[in-house]
């Protein structure tokens, strides 16, 4: 096995003594830093490379912290208007995963870069920490690389805001295989409409 394979096996056993100690030290270190900061290199190089990262010019890693749990609806004095169904304030859960939310926040802050992918690095009682792989599409090393220059096209601007990253597709229920039959046709709504609509074929 290569070195990256050993690193991958380490992260599969997060309850081992080594990983518990390592993650505890890391989350303490991350708590001292700002919630969004640039990382000089990926914390998990094996995972980053599998998601498309390469140690070359134009690739950037940013680390972000996201508060765990649900969100309280930001309404004054709990006054929500409308039907009782929409009166909830406290126990509301996000429709998307925290990883997708983390990608969105990084993408909004760093609008000149493109979000390629992201991965989990640590968590504690209050926060989850992710590293996001970003790409500088104006760098000549990226534009000349046929393996990655697809992301330079304008259609890939703000992929993270449209659910086109891996975490975003996971939140939308999109994938391949029998487990994802509920989104055949592009989305849950499209699949529902196709299954529940009666087709009246016109006889000619």
From Swiss-Prot:
GO molecular function, one term: RNA binding
Record carries keyword Ribosomal protein: yes
Keywords tagged on the record: Ribonucleoprotein, Ribosomal protein
Bias type Basic residues, positions: 190-204
Any one cellular-component term (Gene Ontology): cytosolic large ribosomal subunit
GO biological process terms held by the UniProt record: cytoplasmic translation
Region annotation Disordered: where it falls in the sequence: 185-204
Pfam families: Ribosomal_L15e (PF00827)
InterPro entries: Rbsml_eL15_core_dom_sf, Ribosomal_eL15, Ribosomal_eL15_CS, Ribosomal_uL23/eL15/eS24_sf
Superkingdom as given in the UniProt entry: Eukaryota
SMART domains: Ribosomal_L15e
PANTHER family to which the protein is assigned, alphabetical: LARGE RIBOSOMAL SUBUNIT PROTEIN EL15, RIBOSOMAL PROTEIN L15
Assigned protein family: Belongs to the eukaryotic ribosomal protein eL15 family.
NCBIfam families: PRK04243.1 (NF003269)
Protein name: Large ribosomal subunit protein eL15
Organismal lineage: Eukaryota, Metazoa, Ecdysozoa, Arthropoda, Hexapoda
Gene: RpL15
């Amino acid at each position: 096995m290569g070195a990256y394979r050993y690193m991958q096996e380490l992260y599969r056993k997060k309850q081992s003594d080594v990983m518990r100690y390592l993650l505890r030290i890391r989350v303490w270190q991350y708590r001292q830093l700002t919630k969004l900061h640039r990382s000089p290199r990926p914390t998990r190089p094996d995972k980053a490379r599998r998601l498309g990262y390469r140690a070359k010019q134009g690739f950037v890693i940013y680390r972000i912290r996201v508060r765990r749990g649900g969100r309280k609806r930001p309404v004054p004095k709990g006054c929500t208007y409308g039907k009782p169904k929409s009166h909830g304030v406290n126990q509301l859960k996000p429709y998307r995963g925290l990883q997708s939310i983390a990608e969105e926040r990084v993408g909004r802050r760093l609008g000149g870069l493109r979000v390629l992918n992201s991965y989990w690095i640590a968590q504690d009682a209050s926060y989850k920490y992710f590293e996001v792989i970003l790409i500088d599409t104006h760098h000549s090393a990226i534009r000349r690389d046929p393996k990655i220059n697809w992301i330079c096209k304008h259609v890939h601007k703000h992929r993270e805001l449209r659910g086109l990253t891996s975490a975003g597709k996971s939140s939308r229920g999109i994938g391949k295989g029998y487990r994802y039959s509920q989104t055949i046709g592009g989305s849950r709504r499209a699949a529902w409409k196709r299954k529940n609509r009666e087709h009246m074929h016109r006889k000619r």
